[in-house]
């Protein structure tokens, strides 16, 4: 379950930012996650709740912004929507796709006090 290490990394980032920007508590965290990031959102929520106990983010809301998956098709030279890696191009059926969006996992915004 790599979601646990992701949650731990988020808490570490929050602690670093708290020291740098001098805030004491995190009330909410917004994450952008693409469908190609290989993250199970419900597992991440569970892990986030577990690792934030006793930290400056204890009780913080975890808001997930799901990004669409997109790829450039080398077969028909078009930008196309994809739901998972190794999907065929919905326009021409080619499997020669380069992912351009959807593999992100990043902290987008924080609500702090």
UniProtKB/Swiss-Prot annotation:
It comes from the Bacteria. Keywords: Metal-binding, Nickel, Zinc. GO terms for biological process: protein maturation; protein modification process. The keyword Metal-binding applies. Gene3D superfamilies: 3.30.2320.80. The keyword Metal-binding applies. Zn(2+) binds at residues 73, 76, 89, 92. InterPro entries: Hydgase_Ni_incorp_HypA/HybF_CS, HypA/HybF. It holds the Pfam family HypA. One of its GO terms (molecular function) is nickel cation binding. Belongs to the HypA/HybF family. Involved in the maturation of [NiFe] hydrogenases. Required for nickel insertion into the metal center of the hydrogenase. This is Hydrogenase maturation factor HypA. The gene is hypA.
């Amino acid at each position: 379950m790599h979601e646990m290490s992701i949650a731990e990394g988020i808490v570490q980032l929050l602690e670093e930012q708290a020291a740098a920007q001098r805030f004491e508590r995190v009330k909410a965290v917004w994450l952008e996650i693409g469908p190609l990031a290989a993250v199970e959102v419900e597992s991440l929520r569970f892990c986030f709740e577990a690792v934030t106990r006793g930290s400056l983010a204890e009780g913080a809301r975890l808001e997930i912004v799901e990004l669409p998956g997109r790829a450039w098709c080398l077969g028909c030279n078009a930008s196309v929507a994809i739901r998972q890696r190794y999907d065929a191009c919905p326009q021409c059926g080619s499997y020669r796709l380069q992912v351009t969006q959807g593999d992100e996992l990043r902290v987008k915004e924080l609500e702090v006090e």
